[in-house]
From Swiss-Prot:
Gene3D superfamilies, A to Z: Dihydrofolate Reductase, subunit A (3.40.430.10)
Residues annotated to bind substrate: E30, Y31, K32, Y33, F34, Q35, N64, R70
Function as written in the Swiss-Prot or TrEMBL entry: Key enzyme in folate metabolism. Contributes to the de novo mitochondrial thymidylate biosynthesis pathway. Catalyzes an essential reaction for de novo glycine and purine synthesis, and for DNA precursor synthesis. May bind to mRNA.
GO MF assignments: dihydrofolate reductase activity; mRNA binding; NADP binding
Protein's organism: Gallus gallus
Domain of life assignment: Eukaryota
Pathway(s) served: Cofactor biosynthesis; tetrahydrofolate biosynthesis; 5,6,7,8-tetrahydrofolate from 7,8-dihydrofolate: step 1/1
Keyword terms: Methotrexate resistance, NADP, One-carbon metabolism, Oxidoreductase, RNA-binding
Entry keyword annotation includes NADP: yes
Protein name, as recorded: Dihydrofolate reductase
SUPFAM superfamilies listed in its UniProt record: Dihydrofolate reductase-like
Gene Ontology CC terms, in alphabetical order: mitochondrion
GO BP: dihydrofolate metabolic process; folic acid metabolic process; one-carbon metabolic process; response to methotrexate; tetrahydrofolate biosynthetic process; tetrahydrofolate metabolic process
Length: 189
């Protein structure tokens, strides 16, 4: 795997979850953005892969599992087999990336998306690999019990624009948010 993409929505206190749900009320257009970004493959005949921890998987309503038109990989050291609906189970992010490099999947997968939770984001951001981070900043505070790890802004640079990502502030149901894209570029060793 040559590059990673992570996508997350955070509120102002860097919260990403509360009691297994999102800390804020449903934002339909923000969810559509997540669906569009993670589903759209740029290579004919290939699909994107989404990698997530077990809690993130079970936070998705059952009727929406697996995330459709994407190869769903769940990470867990405890589970013995992939949860119902998931395509693959891996013990760690490294195992999942090795799986994606296997002949079975290499020819089928375009982009690799990390969709949570905290530990999976942290492991991905620490890897010395090109990485784009798609952050929806919700411009309000909401009570949260799960948080996004600290972003190292020495590595991750905010892009001024990115194709397909609206630049202006969005608003739904009185909640304002904006889309940001950060990029970490690692020179080939």
């Amino acid at each position: 795997v040559r590059s990673l993409n992570s996508i997350v929505a955070v509120c102002q206190n860097m919260g990403i979850g509360k009691d297994g749900n999102l800390p804020w009320p449903p934002l339909r257009n923000e969810y559509k953005y997540f669906q569009r970004m993670t589903s759209t493959s740029h290579v004919e005949g290939k699909q994107n892969a989404v990698i997530m921890g077990k809690k993130t998987w079970f936070s998705i309503p059952e009727k929406n599992r697996p995330l459709k038109d994407r190869i769903n990989i769940v990470l867990s050291r405890e589970l013995k087999e992939a949860p119902k609906g998931a395509h693959y189970l891996s013990k760690s992010l490294d195992d999942a990336l090795a799986l994606l490099d296997s002949p079975e999947l290499k020819s089928k997968v375009d982009m690799v998306w990390i969709v949570g939770g905290t530990a999976v984001y942290k492991a991905a951001m620490e890897k010395p690999i090109n990485h784009r981070l798609f952050v929806t900043r919700i411009l309000h505070e909401f009570e949260s019990d799960t948080f996004f790890p600290e972003i190292d802004y020495k590595d991750f640079k905010l892009l001024t624009e990115y194709p397909g990502v609206p630049a202006d502030i969005q608003e739904e149901d009185g909640i304002q948010y904006k889309f940001e894209v950060y990029q970490k570029s690692v020179l080939a060793q």
